[in-house]
Amino acid sequence: MCSSDLNYIYKILDGNQTLHPVLRTDVAPYYRKLNINLMNEAAETLLGENDFFSFCRFREKATTVRKLEKFDFHRNEDGVIVGEVSADAFCYSMVRGLVGAVVHVGEERFPVSWVREVLEKRERQSESLVFAAKGLTLVGVDYPEDAKLLERANLTMSRRSSTEED
């Protein structure tokens, strides 16, 4: 089956905060303090249908064009940064690559415009950080109605250009 949307959350505890033992397996610790406003500005520049080659691990015959529907961050009541990421499909390591790039902006290593520049270069960046799998959780899969499952599967698996419409 092929989904219509995949929904992930990514939890980060920044600034060397003390990690509660219960959260140990669910949250990625990060030693620097992050600016969520800058992270959200950078994330917003990636929304829509784009070729995310720069943020994906290469896989033979796989498309890297995806439609990123949601990518934003907030801090919860425990002080944990929660990133919400939704798309029609994800390439291998794409969520971890996107979060890593936005974290670089959040720590003010690069300007907000940098993530869009990385996207448009269509090449893996040595500066780009692929975040650890710890902290990443699949929270939902939304399927299209039965009549559209095959159409959705074919679109997701086909090679497509970033100018095609869904």
Segments (PLM) and residue ranges:
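Structured-RNA-binding interfaces characteristic of tRNA pseudouridine synthases
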Residues: 1-166
